[in-house]
Amino acid sequence: VTDAPVLLDVLSTLLREDAVGLRSRSTRVDLPDGAWLRLPAHDDALLLPVRTAAPAFQYGTEARLPLLRRESDGTELTTTTAVLRALGALADPRDRPGFAAFEDECRQAETTVRLHRATDTAVRRRLGERYGTDPAHWTGPAAALAFDTLAARLDHPVHPTGRGRHGLTAADLRAYAPEFHPRFPLRWLAVPADALSATGPLDGLCPPPSALGLPARLDTGHRTIPVHPLTAGAPLSEALAAAGLTGRAHLAPEPRHDVVPTLSMRTVALADDPAVHLKLPLATATLGRLNRRTIKPGTLADGAAVQRILTAVAAREPRFRATVLHADETVWAHAGHELLAVLVRHQPPGLDTTTAVPLAALLAPAPGGGLVADRLADRFHGGDPLALIDAVLTRLLDWGTTLLGYGIALESHQQNITLLYDDGTPGPRLLLKDNDGPRIHPARLRAALGETPALDFSDPRIVTHDDRALLDLFTTITVHLCAGAYAFGLARHGHAPLHHLLGLIRDRLAEAARSLGTGPGSMGALLRTQVLEAARLPVKAMVTAGTLLAKERSGALDINKHYTTGPNYLLRGSDPR
């Protein structure tokens, strides 16, 4: 099976992020087969075949063939290893370890893609046998996990190695990853009560130590927290040592509570009560070696605080009371280390007959044929995928831009938004989760709410006094990942002309800008000038910040909010007609 698609995406991403000056130091060369970029390489040069598309999703120019050509002898480099070693040789010596790490990430992604291809048919068949071949009729919290399985087999919209997970084997993926829809029991750790910070009731979920094979004497003075099986070995031992808990905390020999992984993998749903999710730290990384899937203890309280702010906003906006729901993320515990933590996420009640689809699953192939979006359109939108995507965009952009008016931008990407469909209700409702990485502008929040809720966050980056920080986050998450990616995706699948789909996004954003007001300094005016009418838009530089460069080299305060720019595909002049 060819790995060319991964290499093609890698080359386009490195070009967009200008790794080793691939964009800024290259000159264009026109050869008989098309355009190439020539990058000087010591006493030689590397040639990259490119094409220009208008509009393109975050690219002005992209790779058109999965290769680099060495100018001196015509040698073609056609593997990610060969390409990255050639480019890494041009990097600052301080950055070469990052290129070596990216080589490894590419190999992991290629291996995972091959594994997915080999198992796609069997997994979809198994889901169809269990839940039915039409996912529009998959209802309730248990069936929602099957959508996660479909979504986990898709590429990330921006990151070229998004399917890879650092340090995990194929056996690990089959046993614990959402794309295989496994079921497995949790491990448990008995922690001294005085070492555990907790909020909310955990006793009904967490068994006493004696029920897990530990001495009964630990029932007094110790409390248990769940541990992911992948964390229960050496990573846990190292965490206990770092937290000063070696010999004081005890891993129980007996597992308890079967769970099923959600799309994020580190979050699992209780098999017997799938409306309850447990977010558990994992000693792995996704979307870059620096993007570790642990849980910093301070983020737990931050997420709960943001949830309270969103509740206050929703109370002032009646149209969202029934249409935008929030998972409860106020119950959590930690023992002072990023591998010793748990967030207990409760889904809202009343979803047993609801079709709950993560936004990330819309473009996934359905077990019975077509896309998930097609089957949802058939059942809920009269067979019209355009009506479906317009309804989704209307709800998403109304919510996101309303929050901008309050000085809030959420990191609600395609994995954190679930579409809720019920018979006889207009359009999808939204279910939101994971609120720990927003940007909040205190002055705008105070002006809109009439008061300023407590903004005492563990992460000082949450509070900003810069409108640009809000708009950058809104653009890179809501516009690119939750809207633009689906316009380009549906067009790629032949569902509608791209210009029509982009027009829907533009129209909904323009409506939102008008509703926010267009006076000087208003958020509506900024939305128009810095998003709708801007020549270029911020784009996440995920490979640079997450893998290629250490933080001190990239200057990234937050690797998930480190940006380059790309052409604005929403400009009317960019429509290909």
Residue ranges and their predicted role:
Residues 1-394, 422-577:
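Nucleotide/phosphate-binding site architecture used for ATP/NTP-dependent chemistry
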Residues 388-406, 410:
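Conserved kinase catalytic-core helix
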Residues 413-415:
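Canonical protein kinase catalytic loop motif
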Residues 417-419:
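Hydrophobic residue at the +6 position relative to the catalytic HRD Asp in the kinase catalytic loop
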